[in-house]
């Protein structure tokens, strides 16, 4: 870990070169693809654990962050195996980065715990629609923390998605699973809203932190520390509940699908897909902005609703249909507004802005400033 001193010439770090636009857009598209797959798969697998006999919210919390060692591949392979960069891992990773990453990671761990409570009681479709309320908090907190401009485009999107959740709340009595008490349903409802609030805080705070990093690899390093802290939080909770011995007992005697399905799908697949989702979220926030990342995730919640209906037979009545349409409408209007503003700005500039570069040990590192600056600018002016 660096002591914070920078060896490269500061003037070199401000150099701009003509952009490899396709590379920038490709990274953004690939990141969203992994977010798409990871978000939907992790939500369905999280419910899979509870549907077939799993009962520990701490286990459900633990699997959401325990896959952090997978990030070591993205961090170490480029330098030591692929030899595509001379930048050593954790170069310029300062004490400030470490402290903030740990603190954010602990908040993320508690967020995961609240999500687990909500998932254990609510249908996938219901919890997904409730989580869309995070956009209200994300917009407000982004305005406070990173000075995000409130425009017609993002405000319209937030209003539509919030209305979607309000409609769902008014129809909640018809959505309560049979055998579930009103108290437990209320706990699940409040826990899910709380998880949305904390995740809304997570997005702009990480955006502010990512403004102090200079390449995509550093984003993964910050994410590694965050997920490690979240895993420590969950592991302590598991230890108080019986630890891994309880997992073995649950796999062999409680889980109705048997130990093979327990370890393969309820645990391993959950670990991988959750890590994919969180890593892609971080990449999306870094390349664009916290509010854009939140809107992209919220758009996927509509797919989670459909996934819950298909995979678990969740009730999909008129209110949920309207709520889902509002989610899609809100995201589509925001995306279109952002796209039109980007085209207008590109036309005014006459060409794409440059890709910011830095130099480390004589070799150039490319930071995806092109996409980040263009999308953020469009978001501010949409």
UniProtKB/Swiss-Prot annotation:
Region (Disordered): 345-364
Keyword field: Membrane, Transmembrane, Transmembrane helix, Transport
Name of this chain's protein: Probable purine permease 4
GO cellular component labels: membrane
Residues passing through the membrane, by range: 25-45, 62-82, 98-118, 121-141, 150-170, 185-205, 224-244, 260-280, 291-311, 315-335
Cited InterPro entries: PUP_plant
GO MF term (any one): purine nucleoside transmembrane transporter activity
GO aspect biological process, one term: purine nucleobase transport
SUPFAM superfamilies: Multidrug resistance efflux transporter EmrE
Domain EamA per the UniProt entry, residue ranges: 66-170
Main location: membrane
Protein's cellular compartments: Membrane
Keyword ATP-binding: no
Species the sequence originates in: Arabidopsis thaliana
Entry annotated with the keyword Transmembrane: yes
Membrane topology field: Multi-pass membrane protein
Family under the similarity heading: Belongs to the purine permeases (TC 2.A.7.14) family.
């Amino acid at each position: 870990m660096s002591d914070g001193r920078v060896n490269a010439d500061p003037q070199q770090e401000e150099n701009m070169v003509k952009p490899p636009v396709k590379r920038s857009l490709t990274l953004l598209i690939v990141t969203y693809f992994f977010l798409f797959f990871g978000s939907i798969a992790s939500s369905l697998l999280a419910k899979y654990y509870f549907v077939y006999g799993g009962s520990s919210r701490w286990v459900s919390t633990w699997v959401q962050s325990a896959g952090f060692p997978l990030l070591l591949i993205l961090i170490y392979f480029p330098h030591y195996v692929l030899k595509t960069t001379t930048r050593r891992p954790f170069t310029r990773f300062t004490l400030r980065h470490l402290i903030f990453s740990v603190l954010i990671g602990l908040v993320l761990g508690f967020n995961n715990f609240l999500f687990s409570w909500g998932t254990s009681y609510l249908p996938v479709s219901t919890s997904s629609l409730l989580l869309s309320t995070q956009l209200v908090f994300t917009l407000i907190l982004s305005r406070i923390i990173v000075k995000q401009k409130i425009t017609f485009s993002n405000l319209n999107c937030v209003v539509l998605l919030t209305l979607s959740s309000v409609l769902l709340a008014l129809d909640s009595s018809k959505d309560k699973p049979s055998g579930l008490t009103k108290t437990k349903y209320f706990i699940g409802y409040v826990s899910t809203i709380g998880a949305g609030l904390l995740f809304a805080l997570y997005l702009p705070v990480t955006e502010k932190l990512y403004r102090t990093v200079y390449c995509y690899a550093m984003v993964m390093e910050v994410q590694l520390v965050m997920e490690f802290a979240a895993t420590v939080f969950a592991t302590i909770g598991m230890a108080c509940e019986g630890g891994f011995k309880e997992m073995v007992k649950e796999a062999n005697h409680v889980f109705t699908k048997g130990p093979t399905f327990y370890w393969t799908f309820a645990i391993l697949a959950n670990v991988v897909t959750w890590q994919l989702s969180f890593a892609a979220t971080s990449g999306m926030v870094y390349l664009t902005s916290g509010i854009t990342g939140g809107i992209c995730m919220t758009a996927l919640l509509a797919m989670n609703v459909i996934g819950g209906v298909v995979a678990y037979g969740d009730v999909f009545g008129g209110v949920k249909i309207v709520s889902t349409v509002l989610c899609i409408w809100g995201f589509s209007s925001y995306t279109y507004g952002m796209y039109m503003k980007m085209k207008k700005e590109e036309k005014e500039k006459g060409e794409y802005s440059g890709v910011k570069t830095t130099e480390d040990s004589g070799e150039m590192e490319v930071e995806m400033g092109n996409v980040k600056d263009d999308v953020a600018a469009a978001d501010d002016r949409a």
